[in-house]
Amino acid sequence: MVDTDDGASVGGLKGVYKWTVDALFGSGVSPSAKYRGLNHGSSRQRYSQDDTNYSRYKPLSSMRSRSRSNSWSVPVPQDPSFYKRYDLLPPISSDDEDYSEEDKLQYGANSNRGSPMVKGLMNPAPVVPKQQNNGYGEFDRRSTNPLFTDPTDTFARRKTSSSLMNNYRSSTEGIGDTAFIEETRNININGRDPLIAKLFGRITSPKKMANLPGKFPSPAKATLDSNRRRKNSVLHSIGSGRVRETSTSLDDKKILSEYMDIISDLDRNNENLSALSEQVEDRNQRYEEIDTEYKKKYYDMRNELIKELKQSKKTHDNYYLLYNKYKELKEMASESNRLKSTIYNLESEILEQGVSKNREIQNLNEKILKLESRCQELEAEKLLERDKYELRIASLEAKLREQNISNGKNYFSDYSYSHRSREFSPDNYRYLNNYFSEEMSDFDADIPYKNGR
């Protein structure tokens, strides 16, 4: 039921009215109840923060990191040695695969809080449930013991919703709003770790620095039952306009024992941290040795690579020199082949010319032989003709002598003539000339081969 200005109940229009009020003002409180207690300073302070609180209730997609300015607000160098020197977590870039879009919107792209490493620290560790026999030979995995069923969420109070924190703060300030008290009454912290429940069971004003890791507030001074009784007493005293605060303190020895338990836990944690630090130092030293060995191998390999590159360059240069020589030899070989072909052609031409010359020489030799044989024949014919001429001359001389003898004249009485001698007497030359001219004319007519020459 929602009260209006005249105090009448709305009845069936409760859902519509509540929806309208939530849509307009972002709050489940009606305007009459909101502005009824303006004379109270605490109420005025609370309602003046509604707009701010409403802006904090925006969806996760529109949220950004809301934190006060600190040393991380200034730019931090990106040198990895800076984070290693101060034992800081390096910022996770926005292109990290494990960096979800929800973490980017909530914590920002350059925040370490949304990194996978820090998220693993803030999330509770899962606990394997204890298997119990249900009496039917089967094991029931749903154990009723919260130590086995609930995770040990150390930072559960840090991740409590903003509305729950406002309810805590309102109840401690003594605001007489029934809705807030009814909401705070249903708060259940039984599922937490017992030690954490003792530490954070008291309803206190949420302080940002008190919830950071490493900050330990005072132990709880009231149990859950006392808190419930206190809430009931506050609810009972709302009608009278005052809030009666009740508190029950624990025994000092119990508080001291709790402090000692916490200190012993811190000692164990410090020992574990020391062992972990030694392991990390050993691992870092081993990594440095490995890094040094890798650097040495790298420089050795680098020097070897430089030598190989120099040798490769030398081989490359020698290869190109050899290739140029090969090209020259190839050109010379092609030139020699051309010259060989030219020589072969010339030899063939010479051979052909030699054959033709031999044929010509043979023909000339044949002609020479023919001419020689012809000369010999002519020589023989000349000898025959000479013999014939000599015989004719001898016969003519004999005939002349016979005629002279018959005529009684002896012209050759004082002169002896030989056909091998060409000497004649001048006195007888005219007579012989006339005589021989007549005789030779008759003789030429008798020679048969003269006309055939």
Curated annotation (Swiss-Prot):
Residues 34-76, 93-116, 135-161 are annotated as: Disordered. It is found in: Cytoplasm, Cytoskeleton, Microtubule organizing center, Spindle pole body. Residues 61-73 have a biased composition (Low complexity). Residues 253-407 form a coiled coil. Residues 40-55 have a biased composition (Polar residues). InterPro entries: Bbp1_C (IPR029330), Bbp1_N (IPR029328). One of its GO terms (cellular component) is cytoplasm. The keyword Coiled coil applies. Keywords: Coiled coil, Cytoplasm, Cytoskeleton. Disulfide bonds: none annotated. Homodimer. Belongs to the BBP1 family. Component of the spindle pole body (SPB) required for insertion of the nascent SPB into the nuclear envelope and for the proper execution of spindle pole body (SPB) duplication. Connects the central plaque of the SPB with the half-bridge. Required for proper localization of CDC5 at the SPB and for proper M-phase progression. This is Spindle pole component BBP1. It comes from Candida glabrata (strain ATCC 2001 / BCRC 20586 / JCM 3761 / NBRC 0622 / NRRL Y-65 / CBS 138). The lineage of its organism: Eukaryota, Fungi, Dikarya, Ascomycota, Saccharomycotina.
